[in-house]
Amino acid sequence: MSSEIIGTKFKYTVDTSYGINQDGFIAIGTESIVYRGLKTADKGGLQFSCVLKFKPKYVYVNGTKIDRVKVFKDEELKIFEDLQECRSIVRIYDVIESLGDFSLPCDKIKSGVINASGYFCVVEEYIDGWSLEEYCRQERWKLRKIEQLENNLSKVVDYHEYTEDE
């Protein structure tokens, strides 16, 4: 078993200096298990942070087995490639179909391990900062205004209640 993933031009490892449990874990979503990783040239040298998104190779939809690697490469990756000039879209560095002998214990999934038999990896640019959820929670209060009512009273108006002119 290995803690290293061999990509197209780089080697990748999970950044075990990151996270509450020092395991590199960032989040788990509907499509991926996300870890902070380190990207290193094959011959060593500088390391750069990246995001390692481990996605299931196959999912079942209404009893039909769907090849997620094929769907990702044929559909989703093409959309990302078309948007690479847009700076607000994260960059995809690599798509690794076979994880080789890579193995990562993960108590957040039923099988308990991320490996080549069940997952492929999408390597993305790492952008430090708030998650979208954190940002929305922090900024939500700024999307309100106060309207003065009669009798010295005020009313808080949420953004979704603004008129079209505002």
Where are these predicted regions, by residue range?
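Glycine-centered loop/turn positions within well-structured domains
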Residues: S32, R87-V90, W130
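ATP-binding glycine-rich loop module of kinase domains
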Residues: S32-E81
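AlphaC helix of the protein kinase catalytic domain
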Residues: L132-K145
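Conserved HxN/HPN-centered segment at the entrance to the catalytic loop
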Residues: E85-K110
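Conserved short submotifs of the Hanks-type protein kinase catalytic core
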Residues: I114-S131
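Conserved short alpha-helix within the protein kinase catalytic core
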Residues: L143-D165
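Short, solvent-exposed loop/turn segments that connect beta-strands within catalytic domains
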Residues: A41-F48, D101-G118
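ATP-binding glycine-rich phosphate-binding loop
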Residues: E4-A41
